[in-house]
Amino acid sequence: MEHKRLLKVRRRQKARKPEFRRYCWNKKLRLRNKSWRRPRGLFNKLRKRYGGKWSGRIPVNVGFGSPKAVRGLHPSGYEEVLVYNPADLEKIDKERQAVRIASCVGMKKRLAIEDKAKELGIKVLNPSG
């Protein structure tokens, strides 16, 4: 019950969280999709939090994280486990964990994994077709 409430809280927090863009992300194409890096320049206005660079931007700060109990979980509330073959399904706890089939697995083995998961009652996060 507590898990469901915390997942709702996390969803609300993520909706309000700003996009933390790296400094000069709009000037260099290679920085477009990169993750946040703290500005370390001696005269950097974003680091000093003043000037035109700072206005309207929020640097990464404490308080934007999700609740610790649900951090890293899939939005459905399950813990993701990467599976490569049907034998890996034996180690799965179906109440807490869900399966994601690895991208390097071929169609034949993927179908075998899905059949065995259905038989064991395990949720597959990326089923075929």
From Swiss-Prot:
One of its GO terms (biological process) is translation. The keyword Ribonucleoprotein applies. CDD domains: Ribosomal_L32_L32e. GO terms for cellular component: cytosolic large ribosomal subunit. Keywords: Ribonucleoprotein, Ribosomal protein. SUPFAM superfamilies: Ribosomal protein L32e. The keyword Repeat does not apply. GO terms for molecular function: structural constituent of ribosome. NCBIfam families: PRK08562.1 (NF006332). Belongs to the eukaryotic ribosomal protein eL32 family. This is Large ribosomal subunit protein eL32. It comes from Archaeoglobus fulgidus (strain ATCC 49558 / DSM 4304 / JCM 9628 / NBRC 100126 / VC-16). The lineage of its organism: Archaea, Methanobacteriati, Methanobacteriota, Archaeoglobi, Archaeoglobales.
